[in-house]
Amino acid sequence: MRKLFEKVFGTYSEREIKKLDKTVDQIEALEAAYSKLTDAELKDKTRQFKERLAKGETLDDILPEAFATIREGAWRTLGMKHYRVQLYGGMVLHQGRIAEMRTGEGKTLMATLPVYLNALSGKGVHVVTVNDYLAKRDQEWMSKVYNFLGLTVGVIVHGITNEDRRKAYHCDITYGTNNEFGFDYLRDNMVIHLHEMVQRPLNYAIVDEVDSILIDEARTPLIISGQGDKSTKMYFIVDQFVKTLKKEVDFEVDEKANSVTLTEEGVERAEKYFAVDNLSDMENTELAHHINQALKANNLMKLDKDYVVKDGEIIIVDDFTGRLMFGRRYSEGLHQAIEAKEGLEVQRESKTLATITFQNYFRMYDKLSGMTGTAKTEEDEFISIYNMDVVEIPTNKPVVRIDEPDSVYKSEKGKVLSIIKDIEEKHKKGQPVLVGTISIEKSEELAAALKKKGIPHEVLNAKQHEREAEIIAQAGRKGIVTIATNMAGRGTDILLGGNPEFLAKREMKRMGYGDEIISMVTSHAETDNEELISARGKYEELYKRFKAETDREHEEVKAVGGLHIIGTERHESRRIDNQLRGRAGRQGDPGSSRFYISLEDDLMRLFGGERMLGIVDKMGLAEDEAIEHRLLTNSIENAQKKVEGRNFGIRKHVLQYDDVMNKQREVIYGERKKVLEGENMRDHIFSLMANIVDESIPMYTSEATSTPEIDTEGLRNHLSKIFLKADFGFINGQNKDVESLKSQIVAAAEKAYAVKEEEIGSERMREIERVILLQVIDTKWMDHIDAMDQLRQGIGLRAIGQVDPVRAYQLEGYDMFQEMINSIQEDTVRFLFSIEKEAVVERKQVAKPIEASHGDGDAKKAPVVKKEESGRNDLCPCGSGKKYKKCCGK
């Protein structure tokens, strides 16, 4: 029925695109007039648009003219003009939706349309990319057109100073990675002076590779952490124990659930080994956690698939892109357990200081949009979590790539033999081949098999990270064979015949030019540096020479069928498979793709492989004989849908928990900002004092009789510990009216505070209030994050007792939050009343971040973490007023 409807009325995307026809016609109609404008007249359009917006016009009102302006500006500065399909895509992005655009169709240029339009509001636009290289490349490339039209452009990359960050965020347009934007938000909410904040309010973000950032990364929260104080010896002891255990006897592995658990026999062995009576007792929680993480490290985490060992460190491999994730660590002790497994030095565990998921960070923007080559399969998730639908943008030229049916084999061995045969055939006729594998291990096995056959090839995986650009630049040349681990997010088009820009730069390096000069030869920035001017001249000369060569080779490669894609197994996500396929057939070029599948592949083995194997066995096929059957194709797709559904469930689960923390985080960060912005916190302190009194009286009041009985001695003693030196002598057995008593207590507390303020001085007292409020809020919040994390880890057991774990987490989390708020109020007031006239009080961070990472979020991906530690001579963060070394740091 749906297919019939779409045949008559068009697909959802086709209908949505049709609605934009009229506006796109308007934009194209302006081309003739705008092309006649002088540079000065075109540049002045920006000023005119800003004036019109200030007078009440909306961005939608000026959209056709603004798009026509940036279109003409791009032509004059970059020599590129937006195609009609890019105008559609730009409008979809402006509307806060996801534009699905095929590889090589010009997403980077398309984004300039909504970026320019929205930057005119003066509130800032963030363009989010997956890595620093792409952020710098796109900023440098597109800044020429923005600068030409009078807009400022900044870039946020790892390692730049706070001052540079602030400048970049105050530009009209800011490029950067999802990690950097998220960490800056967290860091801004840890500063102790308002001027240290770098970000402006979050206005509009365009997320490139939106599926990678908002779907794949969604299970891994951003974490800023400080140094923990636990010993690392336990990791080695537990690792030695776990290595003595036998699979299926002492522990069981559930690959589908990605979990490993001790059997009853295993529990008994653990209790005997560690001399404990009951591993499930509360006092043994930490030991049980160590054992679980060591079991995971030794049985689920695979060397050269999930991580590599480099320079004595464990470096995580991104599941989806195959890139090395330098600086990231698994959380909850898993990273340390892997270090112990590999016999490396174990780093100390960390304490979480601030955390947020990408889901909740990006939902804070007033408007959010995204672009990618593959998003339609995840549209339900984009709608339910981000309220963004997906619109497929038509290609500029028809796609002529041939997607051949899957070839399914009984065994891994038979599959590999057929892959080698296919590569050999294509290589002989000069057709370039890109082979996609799902792990480093598989790519190296295939490379070894090709070497035996004498077929020259390049390998691109996390271990060859540094040579990535070089390998990709050559992947479309005649007869080249490239093996790549997960091509997602590589950010570089594969050009048939080769990339003349890269070839020219490589030749310049061979001629002795330095890396810095070479990196600047394609920059559009004006310069009076004679060496650079000369280098640019040489580059132009070489580029023309190589362009003639690659153009000739481009035609030769087209004649033999273009780039051929081979998938060595299906990924658990259809989207990743589509990304690999999308590498061929860009801009109307020919190309082909085929996936090779074995019933021994993880996906088939875990989801329906046994049934398939039974059917295939009955057919009596040879190992290297391919099977093609609708039942098999359906089985593969169903397996992928199952995994996608499970992963969506995990991400939704993570979000349900983080939504609880998110509401609490908003309250705390809001309070911090009030303190940073507030000139005078005296009224706020008085309201805290009144709250404490409101909370305290019911604690000492009995409702057993018709007239409330107040334990006056208990109440007086309690209040005297908080409001030091306040005179509460009037609290005696005569107090019958609770409301009257409240007023008297508050008045006495305010009077004592006024005496304290007179003694210290009003101006100094205002700063002391801010210092103590910040210190208490930060200390309590960081402890609360840990407590909530522990609650979450233990809450799963409630499901056994027919209690919804998420609901239990919400209720108990709320109670814990209220307790923290009460504790903040009491500690703040007590510290203020106990401050001495000669006390030295200055703003200091409770903890200083030393690591940024991703948390593991129920997945095998790493947290994004940053770390902090109190100095020996700093005031102790517990609020005692003593130096750290004399108090908690003993």
From Swiss-Prot:
One BP annotation, GO: protein targeting
Region annotation (Disordered) ranges: 851-873
Catalytic reaction(s) noted: ATP + H2O + cellular proteinSide 1 = ADP + phosphate + cellular proteinSide 2
Enzyme class name: translocase
Keyword annotations of the record: ATP-binding, Cell membrane, Cytoplasm, Membrane, Metal-binding, Nucleotide-binding, Protein transport, Translocase, Translocation, Transport, Zinc
UniProt cofactor(s): Zn(2+)
Composition skew (Basic and acidic residues), residue ranges: 851-872
InterPro entries: Helicase_ATP-bd (IPR014001), Helicase_C-like (IPR001650), P-loop_NTPase (IPR027417), SEC_C_motif (IPR004027), SecA (IPR000185), SecA_CS (IPR020937), SecA_DEAD (IPR011115), SecA_motor_DEAD (IPR014018)
Intracellular or extracellular location(s): Cell membrane; Cytoplasm
Lineage of producing organism: Bacteria, Bacillati, Bacillota, Clostridia, Peptostreptococcales
Job of this protein: Part of the Sec protein translocase complex. Interacts with the SecYEG preprotein conducting channel. Has a central role in coupling the hydrolysis of ATP to the transfer of proteins into and across the cell membrane, serving as an ATP-driven molecular motor driving the stepwise translocation of polypeptide chains across the membrane.
Free-text remark on how the cofactor is bound: May bind 1 zinc ion per subunit.
EC code: 7.4.2.8
Protein family per UniProt: Belongs to the SecA family.
Entry-linked PROSITE patterns: SECA, SECA_MOTOR_DEAD
NCBIfam families: PRK12904.1, secA
Membrane topology: Peripheral membrane protein
Self-association and partners: Monomer and homodimer. Part of the essential Sec protein translocation apparatus which comprises SecA, SecYEG and auxiliary proteins SecDF. Other proteins may also be involved.
Family annotation (SMART domains): SecA_DEAD, SecA_PP_bind
Name this polypeptide is given: Protein translocase subunit SecA
Residues binding Zn(2+): C876, C878, C887, C888
GO molecular function: ATP binding; metal ion binding; protein-exporting ATPase activity
GO cellular component entries: cell envelope Sec protein transport complex; cytosol; plasma membrane
